[in-house]
Amino acid sequence: MMQSFVQYTPTKVVFGKDTQKEAGKLVSELGITKVFLVYGGGSVIRSGLLDEIKKSLDEEHISYEELGGVKPNPRLSFARKGVEKAIAFGAELILAVGGGSAIDTAKGIAIGAANPGTDIWEFWKNKKELKKALPVGTVLTISAAGSEMSNSAVLTDEETQDKSGIGSDLIRPKFAIMNPKLTYILPKYQLTCGIVDIFMHTIERYFTPVHGNELTDEIAEGLMRTLIRNAAKAYENQEDYDAMSEIMWCGSISHNGITGLGRPKDFLCHKLGHQLGAKFDEAHGATLSAVWGSWARYVYHLDEARFANYGRKVWNIDEKNDEKTAVAAIERTEEFFRSLHMPTCLGDMKMGVQPDEVLKEMAGKATAGDTMKVGAFQKMGEKELYEIYKKANHR
């Protein structure tokens, strides 16, 4: 039965070619006069994108300060540095130029700049209630995290190797500028990591204990089919505007809540993946594809019909037996990941196969020392997470 829900998606989406030139206008519409720009590596500089955005701000007489250098698995220490600079500048809006790492960092800065005197990690760890944040705007350059429309952000505390998320509608971006052509220059690995992340944001909403939610199911299944088709096209030709457009829009819809309305989300694989990202600095999408198959084989027997439905609706598997269809669906999903040259076990990543004590340590961190259960399809503690890591711990 569909559960009660509240859907709030206030982000203004400006989608299409050359839309980055509208950044200044969108900021001006909000009555903002001082912007703090946040971005990652040199690609936004080399491509001329940053200059285009600055020009659009200049045309609207908007002053700005900037902070570049955001890294994948965005660091808490860097966000703290941004908070200090944004406060000193008197920023009124944080504008992220990049992918999920830049956007999540911007969200962290937006929280900190609106709450001077309180460390942002206090909000992340629920020690302080978040009541205000500066507005955030985004110019998307990587289709992946969906942070351009979501109410969540993830940062990593390098000192403790703790990768954690926060969720609040206060940090949903005011606008998202989405030009698929900006993704043409992505390294292939970034493209495929992003595709996996998009896929996982929906599949981890799809496998939950709540049934009888037809429209949400159809939206989720349609998104996954669309992504699978266009992933192959984009992998062959990254300048296929239609394919890159579909992938970019899938990324936003996959993580703005729509593919999981009326039911709880699982996101246990994200918990597993976050530990791999925090400890070994592995790419987020890779950590997800590396553990999903092991999770699926661990739980599918609890609801073979659900996995079989996924196999029939998403992979068009023509098999009447539910168990055979469920197993085939898991195999087809892993084949999809491998077709993108993404890992399907820990040994496929640079971290390699790990000793038992490392697996137990990560399982413990993911469950706060076995003090909480995670997931929704099956609630799990430290022991179960360790077993899934163990299943994935091979070459």
Which functions belong to the PLM regions below?
Residues 205, 209-332:
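Active-site segments that bind and position negatively charged phosphate/pyrophosphate groups
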Residues 20-23, 46-49, 76-77, 101-107, ...:
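Short glycine/serine/threonine-rich phosphate/pyrophosphate-binding segments
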Residues 52-53, 82-83, 102-116, 149-150:
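Short Gly/Thr/Asp-enriched flexible loops that form oxyanion-binding sites at enzyme active sites
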Residues 1-93, 346, 373:
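ATP/NTP phosphate-donor binding region
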Residues 307, 314-395:
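C-terminal charged capping/lid subdomain of soluble metabolic enzymes
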Residues 115-212, 309:
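A glycine/threonine-rich phosphate-anchoring loop and its flanking beta-alpha core
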Residues 91-107, 141-147, 279-282:
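Glycine/serine-rich anion-binding loops at beta->alpha junctions
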